[in-house]
Amino acid sequence: MVAIYELRTYTLHPGKINEAIDLYTNAGWPALEPFQKYLVGYFTGDIGALNQIVHLWKFGDDADRRAMWQEIYAIEGFMAFAAKFRPLIRIQENKLLLASPWGPHP
């Protein structure tokens, strides 16, 4: 079975990165922490594309991915976080990726 990776990139309105990081730290992460077994990592840009929060998730298959998000969307605390976070986003991009047959795979 080939793992599925979900790469989510949130490009924020200029000047909103610190507010977004505070929201994720205090409201987003507490709701998402129970699902960290799927999380490869969260990242912010330092050079190049700025004002971005990028996160990468790994799932056994698409059914696992859909089940996790369905469970997260049922968490009241996450939905309250999302309502505050969405206005900070200028562009949201989600990609589903398959691991290549060579090289290491996180």
Describe the function of each predicted region.
Residues N51-I53, P104-P106:
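Short, solvent-exposed polar/charged micro-motifs at secondary-structure junctions
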Residues M1-V2, P106:
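Basic/polar N-terminal segments that are highly enriched at the extreme N-terminus
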Residues N18-V40, A49, K58-L96, W102:
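An amphipathic, aromatic/His-enriched active-site/gating alpha helix that lines ligand/cofactor pockets
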Residues Y5-Y10, V54:
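Active-site-flanking beta-strand signature of metal-NTP-handling nucleotidyl enzymes
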Residues I4, G48-N51:
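Short glycine-enriched loop/turn motifs at secondary-structure junctions
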